[in-house]
């Protein structure tokens, strides 16, 4: 198969189709035949072709000969600079020529189809109204046909040029006239200018004035010359198509087509085959023994063995190719050196000498309380200095300098209950003198501008006294709440209090609503607030006293260095005393019997049992001694919490005391 395909491809590659010499495109068979016919026609055309006049009629022979001689002379003069335009490739021209040919062929086909349709209608006996207008259609036929932009003769020339590949008609005419001369010289003797002149010589105006007034008049004359038939009233009766009639007849006669018959035969064959298959008897083969073999388990075990073998093999390969990192070796060397150093340090006993830390600088400085007092004093001095500077640089407010500002303070914008004025304004009967008032104002003006008044703060006028209140009822409610409900006393809302219904709720403004929501200050609430403030002040005083006492205890307490030195001195004295007793040969029992320094002996014996290396310390302080000392001076945290609870109390305790 592959060899046959290769041979066919090779044969197809060897075959070369003919190519158009102008477009270099492959030519089809019908195009080649048309080209050959066109060449034969051009060869058979006589060389004595006469030119046409401007009106389309053939010219006289003498005039034609003179015209041909003049054109030959012109062509001989221009032989040196002539450029053969026939040899230039014009693909657009060939394309448009082919399009015109196709249009003409299409029109011819449509005419043939129309004639065939008319014949069929005539045979079937159907009246064709178009036959009556056949004459008119023939008149307008020339107008319907599409014309090219160029004249008819010019199109024919270029059509011959495109099909046969020969020279233009003008060039062929000159070549036929000079038959005795050389063919090669005649082909190159025509120039572009001569070709353009040939076009204008063969130009006719009739090709471009088909739609003119003259042409329309001729068509009108032809119409009037023919007799017009009278109009006859007829009704169009629709008739069915022949194919519908034929199909209906077939259905009535129950005639089946060949394809339907074949389809029925195939269906019958299939049914018979299926019935034959269903009637056959069969017996199933026994189940093969290979089905019962545990093949899956064997495959799984084999895979597991292979996986474990590959794992071990890869591990061995990795261990064989593994190389330790440099930092691992370095760390191992460090570990060995560290262990050696530890062994040396344990073998050689070293004397641990106590080295005290330097005394902090805060001990020699002033105490924190004194520093705080100094900072407070400096802060007060700075505040006082700043207040004096602001007082000197301050100016009197510009609002107070306005007319009427010195008469009184500005009235606050607050809600006032509408009350009727009991007094009437006094109207002065005297008219003030404007000139004197102006002079007095001019005198007071420099004084007010030179002096800088200090802003005076006045107390707020909240107008709470103007609000009506039921003091007795409020006091009774508060007392009842304190006796029965501790959690619902003032300032919390009492459940027994009746909701006040405002009759003028819709007419109140936002300021009045805000004032109604403000809790009212009573004498009892003022007394309670005063007592709370007093207790807070007492608590702060007690707290400050306790802080001072704590600071005093810390200052009076000896320093850790002093305590360590005292303890070391005591221990060295006790040790020296024991050494003296040992040198004298006295035992501890003798000392205990006599009751001398019994407590000291017990302390020393316990310390020797716990620390056998105490002899090498030479009377220095050990970490255990510091811990014991810290335990002595350490206070119990629970006792401190109890003391703090006794010293400070919460608001709940005060509330319980009030109850």
Curated annotation (Swiss-Prot):
This is Protein FAM161A. The gene is fam161a. InterPro entries: FAM161, FAM161A/B. It comes from the Eukaryota. Residues 96-120, 531-557 form a coiled coil. Residues 408-426 have a biased composition (Basic residues). One of its GO terms (cellular component) is centriole. It is found in: Cytoplasm, Cytoskeleton, Cilium basal body; Cell projection, Cilium; Cytoplasm, Cytoskeleton, Microtubule organizing center, Centrosome, Centriole. One of its GO terms (biological process) is cell projection organization. It holds the Pfam family FAM161A_B. Residues 637-650 have a biased composition (Acidic residues). Residues 34-59, 165-190, 401-428, 594-659 are annotated as: Disordered. Involved in ciliogenesis. Belongs to the FAM161 family. The keyword Cytoplasm applies.
């Amino acid at each position: 198969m592959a060899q046959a395909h290769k041979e066919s491809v090779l044969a197809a590659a060897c075959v070369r189709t003919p190519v158009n010499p102008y477009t270099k495109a492959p030519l089809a068979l019908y195009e080649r035949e048309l080209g050959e016919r066109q060449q034969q026609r051009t060869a058979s055309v006589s060389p004595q072709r006469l030119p046409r006049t401007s009106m389309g009629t053939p010219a006289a022979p003498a005039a034609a000969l003179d015209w041909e001689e003049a054109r030959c002379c012109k062509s001989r003069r221009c032989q040196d600079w002539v450029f053969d335009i026939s040899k230039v490739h014009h693909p657009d021209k060939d394309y448009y020529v082919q399009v015109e040919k196709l249009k003409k062929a299409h029109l011819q086909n449509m005419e043939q189809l129309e004639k065939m349709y008319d014949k069929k209608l005539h045979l079937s006996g159907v009246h064709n109204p178009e036959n009556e207008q056949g004459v008119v259609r023939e008149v307008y036929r020339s107008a319907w046909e599409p014309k090219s932009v160029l004249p008819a003769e010019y199109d024919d020339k270029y059509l011959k040029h495109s099909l046969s590949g020969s020279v233009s008609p003008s060039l062929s005419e000159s070549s036929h006239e000079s038959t005795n001369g050389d063919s090669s010289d005649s082909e190159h003797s025509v120039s572009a200018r001569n070709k353009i002149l040939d076009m204008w010589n063969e130009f006719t105006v009739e090709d471009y004035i088909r739609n003119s007034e003259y042409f329309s008049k001729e068509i009108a004359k032809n119409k009037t010359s023919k007799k017009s038939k009278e109009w006859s009233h007829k009704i169009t009766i629709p008739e069915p198509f022949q194919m519908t009639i034929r199909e209906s007849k077939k259905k009535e006669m129950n005639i089946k087509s060949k394809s339907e018959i074949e389809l029925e035969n195939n269906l019958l064959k299939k049914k018979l085959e299926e019935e034959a298959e269903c009637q056959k008897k069969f017996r199933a083969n026994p189940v093969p023994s290979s089905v019962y073999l545990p093949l899956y388990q064997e495959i799984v075990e084999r895979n597991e063995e292979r996986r474990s073998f590959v794992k071990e093999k890869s591990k061995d390969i990795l261990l064989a190719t593994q190389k330790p990192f440099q930092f691992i070796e370095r760390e191992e060397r460090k570990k060995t050196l560290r262990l050696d150093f530890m062994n040396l340090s344990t073998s050689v006993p070293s004397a641990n000498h106590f080295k005290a830390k330097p005394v902090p600088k805060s001990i020699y400085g002033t105490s924190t309380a004194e520093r705080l007092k100094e900072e407070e004093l400096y802060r007060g001095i700075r505040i006082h200095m700043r207040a004096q500077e602001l007082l000197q640089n301050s100016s009197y407010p510009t609002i107070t300098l306005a007319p009427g500002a010195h008469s009184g303070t500005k009235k606050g914008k607050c809600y006032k209950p509408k009350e009727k004025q009991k007094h009437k304004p006094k109207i002065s009967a005297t008219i003030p003198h404007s000139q004197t008032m102006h002079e007095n104002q001019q005198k007071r003006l420099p004084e007010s501008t030179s002096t800088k008044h200090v802003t005076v703060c006045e107390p707020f006028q909240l107008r709470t006294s103007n609000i009506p209140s039921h003091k007795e009822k409020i006091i009774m409610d508060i007392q009842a709440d304190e006796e029965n409900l501790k959690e619902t006393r003032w300032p919390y809302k009492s459940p027994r209090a009746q909701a006040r219904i405002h009759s003028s709720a819709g007419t109140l403004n936002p300021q009045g609503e805000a004032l109604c929501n403000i809790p009212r200050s009573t004498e009892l609430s003022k007394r309670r607030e005063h007592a709370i403030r007093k207790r807070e002040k007492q608590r702060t005083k007690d707290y400050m006293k306790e802080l001072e006492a704590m600071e005093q205890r810390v200052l009076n307490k000896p320093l850790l260095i002093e305590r360590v030195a005292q303890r070391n001195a005591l221990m060295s004295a006790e040790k020296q005393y024991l050494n003296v007793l040992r040198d004298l040969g006295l035992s501890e029992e003798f000392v205990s019997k006599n009751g001398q320094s019994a407590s000291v002996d017990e302390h020393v014996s316990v310390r020797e049992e716990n620390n056998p290396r105490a002899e090498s310390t030479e009377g220095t302080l050990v970490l255990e001694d510091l811990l014991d000392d810290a335990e002595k001076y350490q206070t119990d945290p629970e006792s401190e919490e109890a003391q703090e609870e006794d010293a400070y109390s919460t608001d709940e305790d005060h509330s319980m005391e009030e109850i």
